């Protein structure tokens, strides 16, 4: 018999037998105000932008917070890229060497609409920047709970399409990060 009994699933209205009370949900953990921004691009400087599900006019690069304070930024970048695009750039993969730590951070005010996700009093986030070079024909598989569409744009157009100023600034740095010392 499958877990959850003959119905194949748990009874959502289940109560504890002795008290008659419904189980108390686990408290929701607050987001850690340390995140990554990963600019995914081709060698031709075409940039992948993804459209947020919770803010339909917001186009962005891959972003996401650390799940645990001890997580490294690279570990967070690999996880977020895989979760949001289906692209695996973990150690030992063909794209693993393409994930470059730009060794830059942005500190910015968290948008008021998202502050409820953080502990009381947290208003600023530190964002660590990465670039990921990929082949132009790489398949993209979005997580529909987070993003609803994607598009590839030339780097300047991608920067202009971003809702986040820090994301736009990161994309505008892309030519310098790919070819240090050369003007864009």
Question: What are the residue ranges of the model-derived segments?
Answer:
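Conserved N-terminal beta-strand and adjoining loop/helix that marks the start
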Residues: 23-47, 65
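NUDIX/MutT-family hydrolases
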Residues: 127-172
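Active-site segment of metal-dependent pyrophosphate-handling enzymes
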Residues: 87-138
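Conserved Nudix-box catalytic region and its N-terminal flanking loop in Nudix hydrolases
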Residues: 42-90, 96-97
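Short aromatic/basic micro-patch
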Residues: 60, 124, 152
